[in-house]
């Protein structure tokens, strides 16, 4: 394994921890800042929207910058945002810190995923991307559960202090392992914009928004769902997040392996399974055993889609991939925001903490429809692409 892939995974661990840990701390943040659970849930949406804004702007700004320097600069921004969150006395300041930290997210994963794909043979690109994203899955297995436990025992601000330190450790990993001569982005700003004129790229981006939105409509409210519906204690949430994170690890590895072989078909099958699991979760959430099992399956299937979703955009973008890859990270987080918002709406409407699962199933079904259309279009165009390659 190239050492640079390890550095990317370490950084992904830090970013993933700060993105997801807030979900396990919604009750603590809500009580401390005197806001409702749905309002606290907007801290998830705010982070996601920060990614959406920051991804294209910072990816374009990094066009002519050495990739190592770009990644280090983005990680410094991440540290600053988490430091602001750690000292935040109010909801508004906390939201500001979340947004600052989020600005680097899309560009980091966009540049990082393209670099990861460039470091290995063509037939291993999806697996290399999956390896980078394994940092996100490990964040859910280790960072999020223990960050949640830390926040429950010492206050939620202590979690953000810990994440700030984690960001500094990630920065050290980048400086140590990513070579100073890391390939410069070869695209001009103009060439990076070309893929965004293609219908298939936008179809892939929309699939990401809806598919991942389905996952986060449910997962955003996992803490109150597990305590108020399934009957778990607040302390059990930490171990439920470990269980979910274990599912993410398994799903990420499985998704990368199958996406290497047949990305389009794999994506369709996984989105079909995601729709089914979310639908079932609405009913299994009523009991502890069913809720725990379904939460694990949600992690497996939800994150198994990630390598295929990112690889599909890179393939459709052709030669100029950095901006398209970054925009797809923004699409993941736009899906997060939409999912969290819709989940909050159904809770506010009085349908209960299990109802967001059905909202998520509807979003995942939309992603399934778009993935099916995209797979059909790619199958029709494959002979043309092969002929062009042979010409």
Descriptions of predicted regions:
Residues 93, 121-177, 225:
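Helix-loop-helix hairpin linking two adjacent transmembrane segments in secondary transporters
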Residues 265-309:
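C-terminal transmembrane helical hairpin of 12-TM major facilitator-type secondary transporters
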Residues 53-92:
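Conserved MFS/SLC helix-loop-helix module at the cytosolic interface between two early adjacent transmembrane helices
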Residues 55-66, 251-263, 347-348:
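Helix-to-loop junctions at the C-terminal end of transmembrane segments
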Residues 97-135:
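Cytoplasmic helix-loop-helix junction between adjacent transmembrane helices
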Residues 34, 66, 87-93, 231, ...:
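Helix-breaking motifs and short loop linkers at transmembrane-helix boundaries and internal kinks
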Residues 316-353, 360:
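A late C-terminal transmembrane helix in Major Facilitator Superfamily
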Residues 6, 77-84, 92-101, 289-297:
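Paired small-residue
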